[in-house]
């Protein structure tokens, strides 16, 4: 078992990385003082893991209610929230109950938002089942849903009471979904740690890492994120914004393609390359740094090009949460392991966008 304690000003909670059910129940006894659990999942995870997980809880004598929403970004909306509120009320979920997010990043976001707002807030636990959720979205308390105009526009910061990461869940993922999680892992290397970059560069094989290394990269990724969240829980100082490297472009790309073409990590991979092109244009980084970023993303076998309209992408990026008064803030990198945040003028962004999307060819 590996354990990380996230120590915030208002609370602290454990990230438990273990395949042991006993380790989970030991942590659960400390985190949730209730007999009633409301397990929220999606239609894909329902088929794979819901029965196992509910039986696991019921064997310990817990009262378990469940709710299932649509899988993927199409289920990450206010309609799903409304469904969960009604379902919880019908099931007798009260303020002392505990919600459990069983699934990937979308489920973590929706279930967290539900927990933050149902009866003005109930406890919740993250049980991520994807590599992306295990290494990024389950930690840190960001919860949100999408609206028509953009991704993650409606949301709150609401910390979980426990994160249980069981890497055995990864055995049911496709290669594409493993790679989807690798993008966020690579992000930590680009923004925080050159040694981790070297490790990934040496370890990546055929677009993935050996399963024996999963727990190590999960632990490393969660450690990076936990330390940042402790220092800047709600993105007040700007330190936590570094975790959004590649995301300004990625969220615009996902919105432009109506969440149908790219998984989140795939969009982030393209977004990271765009951010480094922007860094190069502004002379924030050297050509060698750009090449290092490109090489690792290629080793992970990501598609790194897109043909979306440059002006549409610019318009969508101006709606990003980091933008102020229409000025787009980007996370850029000076070198591997060194990130900076800065506002970039529209004409510069548009010029790089046109080159990046092939409009200038």
From Swiss-Prot:
<keyword id="KW-0963">Cytoplasm</keyword>
<dbReference type="GO" id="GO:0000166">
    <property type="term" value="F:nucleotide binding"/>
</dbReference>
<keyword id="KW-0028">Amino-acid biosynthesis</keyword>
<dbReference type="InterPro" id="IPR030963">
    <property type="entry name" value="DHQ_synth_fam"/>
</dbReference>
<comment type="pathway">
    <text>Metabolic intermediate biosynthesis; chorismate biosynthesis; chorismate from D-erythrose 4-phosphate and phosphoenolpyruvate: step 2/7.</text>
</comment>
<feature type="binding site">
    <location>
        <begin position="105"/>
        <end position="109"/>
    </location>
    <ligand>
        <name>NAD(+)</name>
    </ligand>
</feature>
<comment type="similarity">
    <text>Belongs to the sugar phosphate cyclases superfamily. Dehydroquinate synthase family.</text>
</comment>
<dbReference type="InterPro" id="IPR016037">
    <property type="entry name" value="DHQ_synth_AroB"/>
</dbReference>
<dbReference type="InterPro" id="IPR056179">
    <property type="entry name" value="DHQS_C"/>
</dbReference>
<keyword id="KW-0862">Zinc</keyword>
<protein>
    <recommendedName>
        <fullName>3-dehydroquinate synthase</fullName>
        <ecNumber>4.2.3.4</ecNumber>
    </recommendedName>
</protein>
<dbReference type="InterPro" id="IPR050071">
    <property type="entry name" value="Dehydroquinate_synthase"/>
</dbReference>
<dbReference type="Pfam" id="PF01761">
    <property type="entry name" value="DHQ_synthase"/>
</dbReference>
<dbReference type="GO" id="GO:0003856">
    <property type="term" value="F:3-dehydroquinate synthase activity"/>
</dbReference>
<feature type="binding site">
    <location>
        <position position="264"/>
    </location>
    <ligand>
        <name>Zn(2+)</name>
    </ligand>
</feature>
<feature type="binding site">
    <location>
        <position position="184"/>
    </location>
    <ligand>
        <name>Zn(2+)</name>
    </ligand>
</feature>
<comment type="function">
    <text>Catalyzes the conversion of 3-deoxy-D-arabino-heptulosonate 7-phosphate (DAHP) to dehydroquinate (DHQ).</text>
</comment>
<feature type="binding site">
    <location>
        <begin position="169"/>
        <end position="172"/>
    </location>
    <ligand>
        <name>NAD(+)</name>
    </ligand>
</feature>
<keyword id="KW-0057">Aromatic amino acid biosynthesis</keyword>
<feature type="binding site">
    <location>
        <begin position="129"/>
        <end position="130"/>
    </location>
    <ligand>
        <name>NAD(+)</name>
    </ligand>
</feature>
<keyword id="KW-0170">Cobalt</keyword>
<dbReference type="GO" id="GO:0008652">
    <property type="term" value="P:amino acid biosynthetic process"/>
</dbReference>
<dbReference type="GO" id="GO:0009423">
    <property type="term" value="P:chorismate biosynthetic process"/>
</dbReference>
<keyword id="KW-0479">Metal-binding</keyword>
<dbReference type="Pfam" id="PF24621">
    <property type="entry name" value="DHQS_C"/>
</dbReference>
<keyword id="KW-0520">NAD</keyword>
<keyword id="KW-0547">Nucleotide-binding</keyword>
<dbReference type="GO" id="GO:0009073">
    <property type="term" value="P:aromatic amino acid family biosynthetic process"/>
</dbReference>
<feature type="binding site">
    <location>
        <position position="142"/>
    </location>
    <ligand>
        <name>NAD(+)</name>
    </ligand>
</feature>
<keyword id="KW-0456">Lyase</keyword>
<dbReference type="GO" id="GO:0005737">
    <property type="term" value="C:cytoplasm"/>
</dbReference>
<feature type="binding site">
    <location>
        <position position="151"/>
    </location>
    <ligand>
        <name>NAD(+)</name>
    </ligand>
</feature>
<dbReference type="GO" id="GO:0046872">
    <property type="term" value="F:metal ion binding"/>
</dbReference>
<feature type="binding site">
    <location>
        <position position="247"/>
    </location>
    <ligand>
        <name>Zn(2+)</name>
    </ligand>
</feature>
<dbReference type="InterPro" id="IPR030960">
    <property type="entry name" value="DHQS/DOIS_N"/>
</dbReference>
